[in-house]
Amino acid sequence: MLRWALIFFIIAIIAAVFGFGGIATAAAGIAKILFYLFLVVAVVMLVSALLAGRNITR
């Protein structure tokens, strides 16, 4: 799950480059939305990975 958090974080960074950098002005609004969406998903995956690691009992 930690790997997925890293993947979503990288996607968020790429969306930020396009959205905030002005490279693609036509898609800037969509890229900004995708940045925040994938950033939230990355944080959720990171938190769930950390919580799942703590709850392992054998």
From Swiss-Prot:
GO cellular component, one term: plasma membrane
Keyword set, alphabetical order: Cell membrane, Membrane, Transmembrane, Transmembrane helix
One Pfam family in the UniProt entry: DUF1328
Subcellular location: Cell membrane
Highest rank taxon of the organism: Bacteria
Spans traversing the lipid bilayer: 4-24, 33-53
Annotated membrane topology: Multi-pass membrane protein
Membership in a protein family: Belongs to the UPF0391 family.
HAMAP family: UPF0391 (MF_01361)
Protein name stated in the entry: UPF0391 membrane protein Gbem_0127
Organism name: Citrifermentans bemidjiense (strain ATCC BAA-1014 / DSM 16622 / JCM 12645 / Bem)
Organismal lineage: Bacteria, Pseudomonadati, Thermodesulfobacteriota, Desulfuromonadia, Geobacterales
